[in-house]
Amino acid sequence: MIGLFKVKEKQREQAQNATRGGASVKKQSAGELRLHKDISELNLPSSCSISFPNGKDDLMNFEVSIKPDDGYYHNGTFVFTFQVSPVYPHEAPKVKCKTKVYHPNIDLEGNVCLNILREDWKPVLNINTVIYGLFHLFTEPNSEDPLNHDAAAVLRDNPKLFETNVRRAMTGGYVGQTFFPRCI
């Protein structure tokens, strides 16, 4: 909460300087303020990291890298883009997987099937919750609510073949007719 007061105080100072002939100041939306708070309070596992490809001035667009330390996706690196709306937290962030991955809950275009990004989103949830949800998809892929129906069927019917397909995809190879770039 103290960080929020500091942000507000800094905004007031900048606004006063602007009225005295200083440079114009962009007013932060409530969504930006909440996101700033969420990011400052992140408590990520060591296998997750966050970066700001557009610089720290663009908090509303960032990337999260997840490197699972166990399970089918062990040692792979998966990058997700986050686009956060100015009305956040009343609207869930838009999340896409930049890494092409053989996964029942992520399709080949990078769309992610995670209930808290859709119908189960609530304003009390935060970026930390979303990142943990994504991390959980790699430790416990879900064949019950798939985007990639082929991968889900293999996971459900033949887990050993699923594991082989995941390894083949992560080391850079074909699964069926689809090529997956190396992500290990």
UniProtKB/Swiss-Prot annotation:
GO terms for biological process: protein neddylation; response to auxin. The active site is at C113 (glycyl thioester intermediate). Interacts with RBX1. This is NEDD8-conjugating enzyme Ubc12. Pathway: Protein modification; protein neddylation. One of its GO terms (molecular function) is ATP binding. SMART domains: UBCc. Accepts the ubiquitin-like protein NEDD8/RUB1 from the ECR1-AXR1 E1 complex and catalyzes its covalent attachment to other proteins.
